[in-house]
Amino acid sequence: MDEVSPTKHFTSKPLLPTKTPRDKAISHYVNALNSPRNVVKTETPECGIQIIDGDGNFASTDTRERPSLKNYILSKPEFLKRGMDYNAVGILGAQSSGKSTLLNYLFNTKFRILNEVMGRSRTTHGVWMALSGKESNIVVFDLEGTDGSAREDDYSFERKTSLFSLSVCSVLMVNLWSHDVGRFQASNMSLLKTVFELNLQLFVKEETPKTLIVFVIRDREADTPFDQIERDIMEDIMRIWDTVIPPEEFINSPINRFFDFQFTSLPHYEHFYENFVEEVNLMKKKFDPKNKDTYFLPQYNKEIPADGLSCFCEQIWETIKDNKDLDLPSQREMLSRYRCTEISNQIYKEFNDSIKGEMKILKKGNIIEDFKKVFTKQIDAALERYKEVTERYMETIVEEIEEQLKKQLCGLVESLFERQAELMEKAIGKRVKGEFTIIRNEYALLYNKKEFNPMKYQKYSQELSRTKAVIERDWRKQFDDSVPKFLAEKTKEKFNSVCKDIGIAYEDSVSKMTEVMKQHFGDYLESTIKPKITPYLEACKKDMWKNIRNVINIQFTNGFNKLEEGFKTCSNMNKDTIEEEIKKSKTDILNSIKELVIKRKIELPYLLERKFNNMFRFDNKGLPRKWEPTDDVDTLYFAARDETEDILDMYCYFRIEESDDQYKFTINYRDGDLPSESIETLPKGADEEKVILNHEERKELIETLNGFFEKGYLIALREKENSEIKYQIPLYLIVLVVFFGFDEFIAILTNPLLFILTLIIGGGVYIGYKLNLGGVAKNYIQYLLSMSLSSTMEYLRTIPFFTPLIDKVWPKDDNNTEETQEEIK
């Protein structure tokens, strides 16, 4: 690369240029500020008062033109009521740069603005103040512009007004033209240095609040990235801060201990007026204390009581006014600083241009090989060029700016490395996820619900460990080849973070495969246990839970030995963790069995009715019971009912442990007429999680069963009564029937037709008797007679003559037929 020539690249500008770009911008501003559109569109703008005149006199007394600051504040009762609940804002910047116009648009004030006829001269003299906001909660300070020709080289007044604004303002705006950024003199960077120094010496206490400095970049240019402007300004600020000699108690304090910085920009007022107004309205929201993004944060409030503001301002101004140590740096130092800064900026720009190729590579998402080697070489070359060009200037300034340039270059490389590290981290993360997923999927194929063999999972953890070690080795090599020496310490955390992520991914893969193995085992054990306990649930016997517990204990003993072996071979779990996981698996499987029992609640009424019928309505051979007069219906009924209700009580609770058999959820009144009842409260010592049928469900089911029991009991009693009738016919009645019916008997025997008819009817009666259908025949005959009589009466009811008579002897009864039908059924 060609040697950088100070003459070629860093030529000095004429002292009195005829037409600079800045003057052109000023001309635009003069036209803009005097445009009719520059009138603040508001009904009641706040004009404010001049609290410090151009000669430095404070407004401590009333004059014909204005009241004193004290009387002005006293005329604002709404402001006095606020106490310390208000904020103050001021603005610094070059003369005729549109500061007053900006304040007028932002805060509904009416500060005096530039008149084109008068040329670019001072519009704001000294310091003006106004109250803004619907509740007078904002104090606005408009300061005289800097670098004006009226004061020539007398910078003392500018510095004093700047220091004054810093002492009272929560927020201080610095108004800059975008084309002045990076120009030390035009952007008032030297003034900021003095402000910082004197602010520390005069005002900063341990408890003093911070000040927020907001840089407002005016006439924003589309081809200049705002982020770059922001970085340039912050770099200037940090360079200035590095040169500030603070008091001893703040020797190591960073600038953000005393100041915060924010940046915003606005388009050209004249050329882009609509955009300007729109963005100012957006900016205005930042000055609303109720907005969550407000500039007026509590930590910036100077906490000056409203009624003491005038006294405070006067004392502060007198303190600043009497200060005698406000001289500019020496001309030689200024020249050295300006030229070294200019050369540094040029070197930085060349460096930035030279690495655009690498920036494009990273922007496309590609990793730069040998990142450390490439950029270390370029930084060394840039610093060497800087030393060659600046060797004529003050050594201390050269070294100071060189250190700042080095920080800039390293900062730029650091930002690129952040992208490089991001891409490397993304690539290594993708690799980790891909390789671990492949291994996990291979072992997931071992799943077989009907079989569980823990030995198939044995090599999984070993393969994951080998893969993890290879990835960590590759990551360390790639990282070492990319990290420049000056970033070695800063990037340790990033390296360790990625290593930690690899470890987390490894543990996650082991955990996921462990979960797969647990799920495999659970499905296998459930598929083994459920078919074996289902018959016991359907049989509904008193030893149901005992048999279920036996099945579960046997399967658990055999199965969980396999699971424990699987945990030891597949994962790195310790003994306590394995025991905990086995306990969780047992709980999950028992919950699954409990769900199986709960699902059978729907079938429970049918199972209980079947149980009752098997004991009461069927004999030991499974045939329908034929009730004889000698049968003890009550004993059989109560025995069947009690056992059925015992089965119901067993289903009320998940009796997976032997101690669970002691809990009762129903009250059975043995051998009595009272129906069973559900116990409303949970038995002492019982676990609510094991309850299968709650109180309401038990109560409803008992009511259903009681109706079923009573119905079966009544049917049995009726059948028994019918069977007793055939044993109650007297012998003398049989003799009388034979004696008086002998002639009819002979007539039947001698008449073939009557004889055959008698045999048919008699055979039918005999069969009905043997089958115990007498009661059914009796009910059916009653039904036919009732239906015939009902039909006849209803027919006669339709005849007007018989209607009154029929209504008296045969009232309407719609339920009569239904009851008869139900009786027949």
From Swiss-Prot:
Domain called GB1/RHD3-type G: residue spans: 83-305
Location(s) in or outside the cell: Endoplasmic reticulum membrane
Coiled coil: 373-397
EC number(s) stated in the UniProt entry for this protein: 3.6.5.-
UniProt source species: Entamoeba histolytica (strain ATCC 30459 / HM-1:IMSS / ABRM)
Cytoplasmic-facing ranges: 1-728, 774-825
GO biological process, one term: endoplasmic reticulum membrane fusion
Region (Disordered): 1-21
Protein name as annotated: Protein SEY1 homolog 2
Lineage, top ranks: Eukaryota, Amoebozoa, Evosea, Archamoebae, Mastigamoebida
